[in-house]
């Protein structure tokens, strides 16, 4: 969680084009996400990842999203990444085999115990919390009940799920996350980011202070 003195970081996810990289960086994004799970409409291959990742300047984190993929596949992509985001049913042992720092995405299904999950994934650099829809590993464009997030989680929380420029200020006030993660909320069409929406989202975050 953040404290009142910390700013909320922003990750723009699902980037597929050079111009979207440029727009996100110019707007002040802290991290850029690339979907490397082939089941997603926003997925890119390794050649495109290499081109896009090379365009990212220093001090902006390059994050790759994976869903239950083989270790060797993740390692191959990870040459172009700074951080791995595991969005499937990966066990703590699966995560621990990786050489790259990682965060674990958790879908907020009924009955989930975030304190227990935090203990299970104790080596994670953070926990990304996303809406739950059966059979869909992420990218639902849906929010969830933010009051279900405990205020005293020890690990950094990255809040995802249905965030837009219209609701991100409320999300920050209510959750006080370390970071927020947006994809569809800054798109003109699936996989195509809108520079104006990116700027509006970053502006809302930068002008919002956690209580």
Curated annotation (Swiss-Prot):
Which catalytic reaction applies to this protein? N-(5-phospho-beta-D-ribosyl)anthranilate = 1-(2-carboxyphenylamino)-1-deoxy-D-ribulose 5-phosphate
Q: List the disulfide bonds.
A: none
Asked whether the keyword Oxidoreductase is assigned, the reply is no
Instruction: Extract the GO molecular function terms from the UniProt entry.
Output: phosphoribosylanthranilate isomerase activity
| Example GO BP | L-tryptophan biosynthetic process
By its UniProt entry, which SUPFAM superfamilies does this protein fall under?
Ribulose-phoshate binding barrel (SSF51366)
Q: In which pathway does it act?
A: Amino-acid biosynthesis; L-tryptophan biosynthesis; L-tryptophan from chorismate: step 3/5
Please report a single Pfam family linked to this protein.
PRAI
Enzyme category, top tier: isomerase
Listed A to Z, the keywords are: Amino-acid biosynthesis, Aromatic amino acid biosynthesis, Isomerase, Tryptophan biosynthesis
EC number(s) stated in the UniProt entry for this protein: 5.3.1.24
Q: Which family does it belong to?
A: Belongs to the TrpF family.
- Tell me which HAMAP family the record gives: PRAI
Its recorded name reads N-(5'-phosphoribosyl)anthranilate isomerase
Native species:
Chromohalobacter salexigens (strain ATCC BAA-138 / DSM 3043 / CIP 106854 / NCIMB 13768 / 1H11)
Give the gene name. trpF
């Amino acid at each position: 969680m953040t404290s009142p003195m910390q700013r909320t970081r922003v990750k723009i996810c699902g980037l597929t084009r050079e111009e979207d990289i440029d727009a996100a960086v110019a707007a002040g994004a802290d991290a850029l996400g690339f979907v490397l799970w082939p089941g997603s409409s926003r997925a890119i291959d390794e050649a495109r990842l290499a081109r896009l990742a090379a365009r990212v300047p220093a001090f902006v984190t390059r994050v790759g999203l994976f869903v239950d993929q083989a270790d060797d596949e993740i390692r191959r992509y990870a040459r172009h990444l700074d951080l791995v985001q595991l969005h499937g049913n990966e066990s703590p042992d699966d995560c621990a085999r990786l050489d790259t720092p990682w965060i674990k995405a958790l879908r907020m299904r009924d009955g989930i115990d975030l304190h227990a999950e935090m203990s299970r994934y104790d080596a994670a650099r953070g926990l990304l919390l996303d809406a739950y829809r059966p059979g869909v590993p992420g990218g639902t464009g849906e929010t969830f009940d933010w009051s279900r997030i405990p205020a005293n989680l020890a690990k950094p929380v990255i809040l995802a799920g249905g965030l837009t420029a219209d609701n991100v200020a409320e999300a920050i006030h209510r959750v006080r996350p370390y970071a927020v993660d947006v994809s569809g909320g800054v798109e003109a069409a699936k996989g195509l980011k809108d520079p104006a929406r990116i700027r509006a989202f970053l502006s809302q975050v930068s002008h919002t202070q956690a209580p």
